[in-house]
Each structure stands twice: as C-alpha cells, then as structure tokens.
C-alpha cells in the first residue's frame, strides 16, 4: 500500500509527458504557417542607403563604370550597360586566356602565320615562319599592344583566331558578362553573324576583375602588365625585340595596379585600369572616351573616378556578433527538462571563417540586414539543419548572404521515450 502513491505519481508523470506530446502536436498548425522561413522575413536593421551629391560629373567617356574589385559592386556608372566597341582593351581577355593555357604548357612556342603578319599597326613586325615562345609574345601584346602578336597568341593557344574567339566568349560567359561579343584577339573593329566586336563598361570591368582578383594566373597577369620593359628573341635567336609599357596610368597615381588602353575609329579611346590603396581595390572601365585629338580624356576620367572612390569609400565591418534569436521546437526531447514540450534551441550563422567580413561603403551609406527565420518548428531536427537566412543589403543590392542553422540535434519525443524516462527516473 505504501508503494501505491509512487505508482500514482508515476502514472501522472507519464500522463503529463504524453500530454506534452499532444500539446506539441497541436503546435503543428502554427508550425505549418511558419515552416517556410523565407515568407517570414524580418528587417532587423533598417537604415537609409540614399546617397546625395558629390558623384563624378562631366565625364568625357560615353560609358563609364567604377567598381569595388573585392565584391564586384558597382560604385558609379554612366551608361555602363550600353554596348560599344572596345578596341585593344580586348587584349586583357587574350592575355588571361593565354596565361591559363601556359600553366599547362609553359614552353609553348608559336609559328608565325600569314594572318599574323598581315595585321595592321601597331605590330611587332613578325616574319612568316618565325617562331616565338608564347609567354614572350604576351609582353608584346600588353606593353606595346601589338596586333600581330595577338593573332599569333590566339593561333598558338587554339589553332585559329576563330577557335580562340570561341574560348574568349566562353570565358566571358563564365565570368558573368551578358553583353560581350568577341571576334578578334586584338580588338580591331569586326563584325560577324553574332554582331560586332563589342562589350559594355560593366562587362569590361568584370573581365578586369577576373584577371586581377579571381584567375589562378592573376599574379602573372599583374607581372606582365606592370612590367616597365621587356626584351626577348625569336626561338632561333636571330632577332631581338624590346617592349616598353605605354600605360601612363601606372605612373599617374599611387597604387596604380594594371590596365590596358585601346583605340579604333569605331571605338574611340578606351581604357580599363585598376588601383589598390589602403587595402581597397578599384576598377575603372571607359568606352568611347573621345576621339583624336583627345587622347588625354581617358586619363582625366580615370583619375576623377579613382579619386571619387578613394575619397568616399571606406571598409566597414559586417557585424559578426549579431544576435540571432532562438527557435522553439515543439515535441522535442531534453533529458534535463522532461516536462518541457516546446524547447528553445540556439541558432548560428554559417559564415566561412576565411571570408572577408568587411564591405566597402560610401560615407553616409548604411547596411540593412534582413533576417528570415521561422520561430516555431517540430522535432526532429538535426544539428546543422538550415532554418533561415541572414542577408545584407546596400539599398536594393544584395552584398552578402548567410544560412542559419541549429546548433544541436533535437530528437522527437515519443511514447516509448516517455515510458523509458519514467522507468529510469522514477522509483516505483
């Protein structure tokens, strides 16, 4: 008879635990409404991102863009999506494709064809049948902008100019260029069934960003394009050649990193260049920036845009310590809280440890963080399971996105678990 109260208590405990399961099940209608966390977004910080005044004005270029090379974010644009001829700025794509090819074929040589010899000035002055090391020709291509070297490089890498153009267009698509069409490796005005040889300022900046920030051969690209001069010979050492860098921007501003000029009758003067200072890297792309006798317009526009970036944009830390609220998991198991049928479970931000946690922001510009996280869930849930998303915006532009996941596994409460818990913890 003395044990009877304990049995009663045990039965009541078991009933309470099972009742808890029932209440957890009644949470399901709420859980269903909230399961799609994408539909339950909450703006946790809301700040004005409006920018006022001080933007570059009176640019000579018909199309221009300034981007942050780290993120690819556009900081300033003028008709940056208008398709225009690009002249010899084309050669940055020719160069990076050749450098990536050389990684697997470091001693590649090129025999000069009639097509290469026939290219108009500016040219190296090759002779049919001569042979050169492919890497030597890249200095001729980038320092002197030799058109014959561009054709020789294309033929050495792909066998023909046409096949090399296919590689150029494939690489452009890979980079994310949407309005670029390559026909020639040197940028001379051309037209085919796909259209004219052309790009946009925005696409051209993307290509330069790939060359200096993303490609496996970015360091070699900088080595070639920054060289003051370079000497080489044909493979039989019969003739010697000397190249000098004509990119005046490299001596124009502290931190000037790389660049390529261009000019044709259709394109006008063009330029794409980059600058790195105080851990900030900017890229400027200009198309149709004057015609003769206005050769200096591109340098004025480049300086104006670079100075705008340097003066107004600084890095700001993305808040790594942002507090994410716990979620409630119905019908879960916690041995330390057996009577609690709705558990509070912590959530973490899945941010790669090596990722740059800073973003380039204009003075007066603010970050906006959007938290998408459902408050109620049903067990079971596994550790690391995705339960939401944290997204950062600058105005309407998404600049970072991180999944949210739970920190621990939550097992489902069952009748059998309740019975086992009572047997284990209650003395009958």
Predicted regions and their residues:
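Sec-dependent N-terminal signal peptides of Gram-positive bacterial secreted proteins and lipoproteins
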Residues: 6-26
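Hydrophobic alpha-helical transmembrane segments of integral membrane proteins
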Residues: 12-13, 88, 255
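Compositionally biased amphipathic helical and low-complexity segments enriched in hydrophobic
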Residues: 13-18, 31, 125, 361, ...
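Active-site-adjacent loops and short helices of periplasmic peptidoglycan-processing enzymes
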Residues: 2, 27-216
